[in-house]
Amino acid sequence: SKSSNPNFKEGDLVRGFGEWADYANVDSDSFLVLEEGLDHEEAYLSALGLNGWTAYVGVMEVGKPKPGENFLVSAAAGATGSLAGQIAKKAGCRVIGLAGSKEKCDWLVDDLGFDVAINYKEENLDSALKKYCPEGIDIYFDNVAGDVLNTVMANLALNARIPLSGLLAQYNEKGARLPGPDNFDQLLMKRATITGFFCPDFLEDGPRIEALLSEWYKEGSLKFKADVTIGLENVLVAYKKIFTGENIGKTLVNWNSTSSGVAVGLILKSGTSAGGNTSITTCRIYDPSATVSNLIEAGVSN
């Protein structure tokens, strides 16, 4: 059936929040009509989606970078960290990424333009930070917390800023709370700040941020990688990758194992069903003539 919502016409490409399910009833006011024509429509769930918005806000509005500053990001090969490093580079920072494999480190330096990538599983992190940032870290975009944050806090520059985006170390503790930093005094001695920020804080500003990110993406200066798993039944397999470090870039699940189209998440295209003025109903119906299949985002929003 066609949508009777006046805000949407048949064939619109839209993005919004839904459920990991064949059918979902969602508020249509939360859906945005997207510009079509990108070479990779998965970008709307990564570089141009919440990951991109989070990276931009954390770097530019919380971190407030200055040219020449040392910018460090953890989980640097993840969906948000990889974008944060690129945005910091555009702001003139010297960018150092933390990742857990040679493959990830090579991608950060060779493809994304990071100045340095540290394999924290192979190198002593404290020694590496002192080697690559002898004058200290000015901005630390933290996606992890835990022991990594402790080590970084011992290597801060004066007036350092720590945008706190995620707590991956906490998520892996199965409900147990991690202890706080044991060198909390460094915040005082270095006049440093830790600022937590979360996507609901800037959702209303998303379209403005997305317009800026879109220009960078189209000119080729903002890149991403999608790690796509096939089949809704494998959503937990994909979800697990985020916490075990098996993914590189954005973790996505393509609902249709038979689809030949590009995957774009929680997206309605021709062939899906929409009805009512206050809600959109999504279903796993694939129109083989459509250029896009239904996709869902597998993982935390940032």
Question: Where are the regions a protein language model picked out?
Answer:
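Glycine-rich beta-strand-centered segment in the early N-terminal region that forms part
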Residues: 1-20
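Short helix-loop-beta connector
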Residues: 39-41, 64-70, 135
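Mid-domain Rossmann-like dinucleotide-binding core that forms the NAD(H)/NADP(H) cofactor-binding site
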Residues: 48-123
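A structural motif shared across PLP-dependent enzymes of the aminotransferase-like
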Residues: 17-31, 205
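Glycine-rich phosphate-binding loop and adjacent beta-alpha segment
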Residues: 147-222, 255-257
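Short amphipathic alpha-helix with an adjacent loop that forms part of the alpha/beta core around
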Residues: 124-134
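C-terminal capping/lid region of NAD(P)-dependent oxidoreductase domains
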Residues: 221-228, 236-260
